[in-house]
């Protein structure tokens, strides 16, 4: 069970005259790599989608539903995944989640040829496999975020969480290059098989090295533990008993802050999934960009993410110190969504490809950056059961990710891509208004 940290020996608490070890940052690094791999696995079909669509003769609407299947599975299992982490331990649940999404990433390569799935048709085969893959990935980010609550003190938490989520940006940068190169040399199926193998190795590393709590890790010395616990609301006392953190669901669902987080995340993830699913195809078919250049340009929103997410984590911490958590977190999100919405609108109306793609990429990076503040706020308002809270918030966000490729295809087919991106800009602004419901300085319990 992922309980409060176990009792700490008195000697380990008192002997803090050592140079602190940095195991917590090794854990954050592994979790950031995991976050990056999840996004490579999500983006691979968006990049390989052109080839899949041509081979199996899928129209845009069918492809939109296949893209959406992943997000639907992702939405369905976020809350159970977070609850399982709270109940049975982050390490076990995270390892199982990584193995699940890695295995089904590999299965994507052969889905239509499997006896059971093949009988349903190619479209259903891909959709089912992507749905199950989404189930596996659903637990990964909320469980990783829960680990942040235990492994980092409050003063480091926003920055550490931003590094963790910047792994998403690194994965987004790597995906078009790695997947594009693999497809050109070995075909689209190879990218799924290789990524499945990489995920299996990463799952084994995390199971071996990462623990639920820093107290359990043999490499953490007393000074590092004191640094973590000195600013943590969930740190132990020497004689603390071990109790299960039961989630007060009635308080959670009656909390305006929780509803604000869910609505805001839904609206932030909607435009993000345009970049995850349709951006490569948009560049090739609408903007007329050559495939090799499109592979590189597809990385642009995630390059922006790589720099903007840590910056927004730092800004969020500084704003919270100066303005208080409620006003500081809200101001940081509003800065991101206002700029993102403006750039989405401007980019969709710009004819020059270089300027247009640069604006759209910056908009995508700002959406990622603003969303990182939401994860920190989950720990602000409910650190003891942040796995469940993060899972609930991300369930709503994933519904935005499910709707995004389907509705975007429908709007683009009927009215054109300019309107599809303008609508995404409007949705982004709504995410900012949801923050008037959120009180980051008040715990739910």
Regions from the PLM with identified roles:
Residues 2-34, 40-43:
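Cytosolic juxtamembrane N-terminal segment immediately preceding the first transmembrane helix
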Residues 45-47, 253-310, 371, 375, ...:
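Extracytoplasmic gate region of multi-pass secondary transporters
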Residues 68-83, 299-312:
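Central cavity-lining transmembrane alpha-helices of secondary-active solute carriers
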Residues 99-119, 338-351:
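C-terminal ends and interior cores of transmembrane alpha-helices
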Residues 129-168:
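Cytoplasmic helix-loop-helix junction between adjacent transmembrane helices
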Residues 168-217:
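Helix-loop-helix hairpin linking two adjacent transmembrane segments in secondary transporters
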Residues 326-373:
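C-terminal transmembrane helical hairpin of 12-TM major facilitator-type secondary transporters
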